[in-house]
Amino acid sequence: MTLAQRELLVLCALATMGDTSAQLGPHGRACLQVGNSKAEVVAALVHCFPYIGFPRVAAAIRAVKGL
């Protein structure tokens, strides 16, 4: 697994937990630093929607929105 894939996985795992906006920002930045695009970050979070629900996905996207 590449570092970029690992960071996306961590970001999605944090999104599933809820109330992790303080951690989502730094991991969102790390996603970009290791080579993921903003579109990939958002797509990974949107892919979580059926599993974790809209409120958590929306909160995660808000947390990484300003990156």
Language-model region placement:
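Hydrophobic alpha-helical segments
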Residues: 1-67
